[in-house]
Amino acid sequence: FYGDNIFRLFRDDSGGIIRDPKAEPEAKILVDQPRKPVSRLDVGTEGDTVTITTGKIRVEIDKKTSLIKIVDLKTEAVAVEQAAPVLFEKGKTTLSLKTGPEEYFYGGGVQNGRFSHKGKVISIENQNSWTDGGVASPTPFYWSTNGYGLLWHTFKKGQYDFGAKEKGTVNLSHDENYLDVFFMVDDGAVNLLRKFYQLTGNPVLLPKFAFYQGHLNAYNRDYWKEDEKGILFEDGKRYKESQKDNGGIRESLNGELDNYQFSARAVIDRYKAHDMPLGWLLPNDGYGAGYGQTDTLDGNIANLKSLADYALKNGVEIGLWTQSDLHPKPEISALLQRDIVKEVRDAGVRVLKTDVAWVGAGYSFGLNGITDVAQIMTYYGNNSRPFIISLDGWAGTQRYAGIWTGDQTGGAWEYIRFHIPTYIGSGLSGQPNICSDMDGIFGGKNPAVNIRDFQWKTFTPMELNMDGWGANEKYPHVFGEPATSINRWYLKLKSELMPYAYSIAEESVSGMPMVRAMFLEYPNPYTLGKATQYQFLFGPYFLVAPVYQDTNADKEGNDVRHGIYLPEGQWIDYFTGDLYEGGKIYNCFDAPVWKLPVFVKNGAIIPMTGPNNNVSEINPNHRIYEIYPHGRTSFTTYDDDGVTEEYRQGRGVKTRIESALDGSNNVTVTVHPSVGDFNGFDKKKSTEFRINVTRKPDKVS
């Protein structure tokens, strides 16, 4: 037992003792101290049944069949029960469990295009498959609405059948010769996710700059030659890019070779010139790029530091993409040589993005690599908080990194469509930090899709602008008007919502994800399945229904959205203020090209800040609360230094805000004293209240 309601079942008929799963390279699924005290442990016999009882569950083992049943003592209901003996075959073990007709299942990691698995089969397998139906980052963990979760303690691939082939039975298998699983029993998603985190680690809280758009490309490899069909640059000429020397101008990070407009520095300038938010930059995201053109690794590190210094002056952090091993190897050329310690300590790297070139083998390999990087970034980066974006992960990845969904083609509605349930499912699998490329890495040339992708991802954790591979440049201003202004507006809105987003991000470290399935707040037969897979909640107060298809669009992209389910309560169109009654499904919702269908729940309290382009522009001495008075509601904001690991030691500040509307339409807003502290926290703040009302107030006091 790993606590009163976590039970480990280990069985190896070949005689092996309880152990960690084999991992090459070495990695650990469990944290160093996964156990919690057990309040009591009573073993008894009742007829043909052996019982093991803790303070919260009773494990019943049938003497004749060895089948196991686990009862939740709080309800005296059976949470989970074996349907058949464990089946051991050569290189495969199968566990069969009973399931009821009203039971639903979630988890399995980043299962592209899916989140609710009742009656389906999912692969717990490193597939390197990035489109609908593929698996971008598997996790051998799922949970049931019946009140249990299961973690299979293995690095081997598996398959989970939730009643697809055999109705009434869940068949779970992994390519392993023994059984090692953890049963977690509790009520609700949050409690079961917390049990999963107890065993495998809490998700990281991303640094604040990570919530801003990032730009990724290679700026140390290609040559640019004038071509009338090429890309238009600031000098008024068009250039075509080539990875081979075509007689053109070679790019570099810092633009010191009369090549500034092709440099990484120019990217930062470009975002500033177009007044677009930018939080971070990866200048080597491309095979064979490197980050310097000198004959030595140290010379290239100095080149990288020069870019980092320039970026930091402009409020932007830098990071690196990984192609090769991150530690020096003499046989590798200076161009591709890596030294992650010097990159972090000397050059100031604070972001790392993995790819199939490095972690594509998946399973323990990806977990091993990011474990190393996370420790180095903190130790050599002045206790800096690692920002790692990975894929091909496993159980435990969440304690070090966020996930991106891989390489896909933008410019098509399918790109948006399948990503919505993908994001929802990632959070239900214990990985709240999920992202994808803005309008895809490939394709493009569809302004409507580009705009709609920027819109809905305003209400997600991260945004990756992966440039250099598409049919057009991947800048938010690339399509001109109206796309430029619309994309800027939503990027600015994302920056304004930072206090709200950061607060729900902190909440996701110990439970409820940021991007929430509708049933997490409003469970009913309609929300538990796939009916609401194309909408979600962003925290407790925003309901987002992305435009994910061409329903009846005109040539400008103005359209309507069908099938928006508003749960019980009152919902307000965030952009018009129109009030909608919940408990209904709305069709033909007007969605002109500028407008994302997004609703705020009446009673909401939204902490905000002024529009900004990066974290350094946020005024720490001014706080904004936007309030929609209705009944009695509350919200607790969270803040910390946003850059270090000190939040893990409790260095943060929480502030509770309450709103109360009485029967006489009197509104009382209470901001309680802040609790906590962190380095740089200023207790003296001005406060701005934005209280949404239906008419001018009679009096304010």
Q: What is each of the regions a protein language model found here?
A:
Residues F1-F209, G247-N254, Y260-S263, D269, ...:
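N-terminal accessory segment at the very beginning of proteins
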Residues I6-F7, T49-T51, R58, L67, ...:
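Beta-sheet entry/capping signal
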Residues S14, S66, N146-Y148, F155-K157, ...:
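Short, glycine-/Ser/Thr-/acidic-enriched flexible segments
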Residues A23-D32, P277-N487, M518-P523, T527-T532, ...:
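Aromatic- and carboxylate-enriched substrate-binding clefts and catalytic-loop regions
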Residues K195-D258, L278, D285:
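An acidic-aromatic substrate-binding cleft motif
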Residues R250-Y260, L326-L335:
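Active-site mouth loops of central-metabolism enzymes
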Residues S263-N284:
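Catalytic domains of carbohydrate-active enzymes, especially glycoside hydrolases
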Residues Q375, G402, L428-N433, K445-N666, ...:
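Catalytic core of carbohydrate-active enzymes
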